[in-house]
Regions:
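Active-site loop/oxyanion-hole signature of alpha/beta-hydrolase fold enzymes
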Residues: 28, 40-43, 48-50, 88-128, ...
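Conserved alpha/beta-hydrolase catalytic His-Asp/Glu region
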Residues: 181-246
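Conserved loop-alpha-helix segment in the C-terminal half of the alpha/beta-hydrolase fold
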Residues: 255-298
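Catalytic histidine-centered segment of alpha/beta-hydrolase-like enzymes
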Residues: 295-307, 311
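Conserved HGGG/HGGXW glycine-rich cap/lid loop of the alpha/beta-hydrolase fold
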Residues: 46-96
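Alpha/beta-hydrolase fold catalytic core
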Residues: 1-60, 82-84, 121-122, 281, ...
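Gly/Ala-rich beta-loop-alpha elbow adjacent to hydrolase catalytic centers
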Residues: 129, 133, 137
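Flexible "cap/lid" loop of the alpha/beta hydrolase fold
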Residues: 138-142, 149-183
Length: 329
């Protein structure tokens, strides 16, 4: 077992951890995507592309959460490509995308639409986004709804203003990410955020192996010359000070002129001031036209906990949208 990640896996009994990659997973990650890069704000963006059955097939855009990357979907996208073309995006400052001089939710949304445009789909795509990516997808749909067909947010909770909490309000300054001497040391410290146990330990290890990068002494990738060589995390720590999620998300969610859906982990976490069920009830009130449903057995990181159920739910929602004419607009 490579990961020693803050005790999150220790919450599970040894017999609950699945250590060996099952056949479906091995076959999925053997389906390698095409890596594509897009110039953006004196930097570049990266996304992964998996071809579907034809260029004329409908299209899916997948977006990761905070501090994550497109590789979170390496084993999800191939489950969708028998039916759809799929891209998985790296947000600016995360994964293989470059770092920017500054970040905001609007800049994130601009980056998303630039990659979607670069994919040059034959028809408007459905946007499926997880956690922090769910917020970014809402802002993207708010500004660029005419370039999207539908939107699904996955375990991102739109809260009423009186219980909304700005995620990064207590981060006044950033610190360079820690540098570990070896790749193995870095991977052993990988942990999910928010932290949770995950029975699919083979997936946690796979994600961890794609979450680190090598740095050399004097390299400027850490927002300043690194004083040591080794391995560190791929995300830019300067994203968070001053980053605003916004109190206007309920109005944005309510008014997006697209079919929407919400997928949630049935075992995901509650919040300090309100339960997850109460938040989902609030979201249903905002969008009574939209399905909001749980994936049984999944915590916050749905695609890690229940990957095939996650993919099946996406496929079912895509078929519902097709039948209701969402892709004909």
């Amino acid at each position: 077992m490579k990961t020693d990640n803050g005790g999150q896996q220790a919450l599970l009994a040894e017999h609950e951890l699945i250590l060996q990659e099952p056949e479906w997973f091995r076959k999925a990650i053997e389906n390698k995507p095409e890596n594509r890069f897009v110039p953006f704000r004196e930097s570049q963006l990266h996304y992964s592309f998996w071809a579907g059955p034809s260029a004329d097939a409908q299209n899916i855009v997948l977006l990761h959460g905070d501090g994550a990357h497109a590789h979170w979907f390496d084993f999800i996208a191939p489950l969708l490509t028998p039916y759809y073309n799929v891209i998985a995006l790296d947000m600016p400052g995360m994964g293989e995308s470059g770092w920017l001089d500054g970040y905001s939710r609007e800049i994130m949304a601009e980056a998303m639409i630039e990659m979607i445009r670069h994919a040059n789909f034959s028809s408007k795509p459905a946007f499926i986004a997880h956690s922090f990516g769910g917020m970014v997808s809402l802002i993207t749909a708010h500004h660029y709804a005419d370039e999207l067909a539908a939107l699904m947010i996955c375990d991102f909770h739109v809260k009423a203003p009186d219980v909304h909490h700005e995620w990064y309000s207590d981060i006044e300054s950033w610190r360079p990410t820690r540098v570990y001497k070896t790749r193995e040391d870095a991977e052993a410290r990988f942990r999910l955020a928010p932290e949770q146990p995950c029975e699919n330990h083979f997936i946690v290890e796979y994600i961890g192996s794609h979450s680190v990068r090598e740095v050399q002494i004097g390299e400027n990738g850490l927002r300043g010359p690194s004083e040591e060589a080794g391995w560190t995390w791929k995300f830019d720590p300067s994203i968070y000070p001053g980053f605003t999620v916004g109190y206007d998300l309920p109005e944005i969610y309510k008014s997006i002129p697209l079919p929407v859906a919400g997928m949630f982990g049935g075992a995901s976490h509650d919040f300090d001031q309100i339960s997850r069920r109460d938040v989902i009830a609030y979201m249903r009130d905002l969008r009574p036209d939209a399905p909001h449903y749980d994936i049984s057995g999944a915590r916050h990181h749905i695609m890690l906990d229940q990957p095939r159920a996650f993919a099946s739910a996406v496929l079912a929602q895509m078929e519902f949208w097709r039948a209701s004419g969402a892709f004909q607009k």
